[in-house]
Amino acid sequence: MQIRVTATAAIAKKVHKNTGFQRFINNSLDRHFSGDWGDISEEDAAANTSDPLYALSAYTAPDGVKIWIKQDYDVVTVLFPSEY
């Protein structure tokens, strides 16, 4: 299976303006793919672990900006929580 990673326009805009944010996104994707679901409840983490192809993870950047990573089988989307 080939995973396709996408980002919303707002995420792409912030990445384009801020290389530090780009590094944060890359690190967050690495964490997501390794099963580190970030800042979510234990219940949600257990659901992700039981079915990682349909997972939602959440991470907070050093500047306080929060992102979500939503996986639906072979499509992974990086977005801001307000975009869900």
Q: What do the PLM-derived regions correspond to, one by one?
A:
Residues 51-84:
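Short, compact, well-ordered microdomains
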Residues 1-57:
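Compact soluble domain cores
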